[in-house]
Design a protein with these regions (language model features):
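Conserved N-terminal helical subregion
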Residues: 1-72
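Short coil/turn connectors at secondary-structure junctions
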Residues: 40, 104-105, 159
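Short acidic-hydrophobic surface loop/beta-edge motif
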Residues: 39, 87-91, 156
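FAD/FMN-dependent oxidoreductases across multiple families
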Residues: 118-184
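Conserved FAD-binding catalytic core of PHBH/FMO-like flavoproteins
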Residues: 44-135, 139-143
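Active-site phosphate/pyrophosphate- and oxyanion-stabilizing loops and adjacent acidic/basic residues
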Residues: 10, 96, 150
Length: 184
């Protein structure tokens, strides 16, 4: 199944807040981090790459630029009752994925390493139509583009601080993959 990051995050947060053993802190004051070691928490889970904890303990990163661009869009199509099968095609330009969202919408991720094709949005939309075998497409929304990069933390934990999610593995534009890789 595919869900938006916000829906997933909100659902997870709601369930975690019901657990009396978990405390949430909305940290506005940077001094909070310097006092964190003195609080005696058994475990601290850090998912944020912008805070002092990450910068101090987890900023030793392995970075890679894949010299590719991922284009994403939503196709609007005729209703399909069981639109629940993702498809991926390995084209000579790069992988193209059709990821169902609803009965009438499907998300597209087309990772392109062909230097000439990266600049030709009309051709990209033509290729989406060409490889599409399931949908009667009514509309293809504007293409968004993201450079494909990897950022991997060389340290997964420090004492009682655990790096998690995108703070551990960040792969763009595959939103959420850092979290998925952590679960694996």
């Amino acid at each position: 199944y595919m869900t938006s990051y916000n829906n997933f995050f909100n659902s997870l947060e709601k369930k975690l807040k019901k657990n009396r053993l978990i405390k949430f802190k909305n940290i506005q004051n940077k001094e909070f981090y310097s006092k964190l070691d003195k609080k005696g928490y058994e475990i601290i889970i850090n998912t944020d790459t912008t805070n002092p904890l990450f910068k101090k303990y987890f900023s030793n990163l392995l970075n890679k630029n894949y010299d590719s661009i991922a284009f994403t869009t939503i196709i609007k199509h005729s209703k399909i009752e069981n639109n629940n099968i993702a498809e991926q095609f390995f084209t000579k330009y790069g992988p193209l994925a059709f990821l169902p969202i609803s009965k009438t919408k499907t998300s597209i991720v087309f990772s392109i390493f062909d230097k000439n094709l990266k600049k030709n949005r009309t051709k990209i939309k033509e290729l989406i139509r060409h490889y599409n075998k399931r949908y009667q497409i009514k509309d293809i929304t504007d293409l968004l583009e993201f450079p494909i990069n990897l950022s991997l933390s060389r340290n997964y934990y420090y004492k009682n601080i655990l790096s998690f999610g995108d703070a551990l593995h960040k792969i763009h534009p595959l939103a959420g993959q850092g979290f998925n890789m952590t679960l694996r």
